[in-house]
Amino acid sequence: ESFRKLDVLLSRQSFRLSFWRAATEEINYRRFFNVNELICVRVEQEEVFNHSHELIIHWIRQGKITGLRIDHIDGLYDPTRYLMKLREAAADCYVVVEKILGPGEDLPTCWMIQGTTGYEFLNAVNEVFCYSAHKSKLTGIYSRFSRFRTSCEDLVAEKKRLIAGKHMAGDVDNLAHLIKKTAARYRHGSDMTLHGLRRAIVEVLVHFPVYRTYMDRETCRPEDPVYTKEAVRKAMWTLPELANELQFIENSLLLKFWDDLTEEEQKDWIH
């Protein structure tokens, strides 16, 4: 009886308690990677931003804080607009972001910040302790000892496929439903299946060369379309039977609308 009453009480909450592994296959919120407890705060909403930043901004204006470290900036819905709002509220504050930059990748120039927290610097420091001329020798020793012959590139792709397809299946499923809902309105996408879209999404994620892109109707780094096309091209090479799904995903990511879309339909596409 006591458990029944507890269940009634918990069922009245605005959240549902569940076994933590359920989120692998079914999830309705954004989180950091696959860590269920690190729930994303929707700071893209004005009310949420103001409420969650009120004390921080108050301390900045009092001179108690002179710098901010923005953790996991890429987990936000719209990092660029977030940083614009933050800069409006804290014009003279020193701001750095935790950002994983791929080889040759630069920060978006429209971000009004002082830089990153320094991961790329740590990578450079690590290279000081690694004599690259002996790479082939070390690789040979490792291969003979482990009897492991898979290349680094193939191993990365294999593990990305495992993480995206299994440990983040719920997130992929949500994306597949969103894309299918949009695609079903048009003759180009009416026959796409959820299964095919799931496979296509995972494969694009596997081949994506950077952590994320920053594209909307107003801002876009010149390199972002290049990253997107590269990922889709490689995905088409491994899954040629899903060329239609992959092309639709590319058009969605690049905001290439069909000519007959209404303004409301274009907003849904962007979402």
What kind of feature is each model-predicted range?
Residues 73:
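Conserved Walker B
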Residues 1-67, 76-271:
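Alpha-amylase-like alpha-glycosidases and glucanotransferases acting on alpha-linked glucans and related
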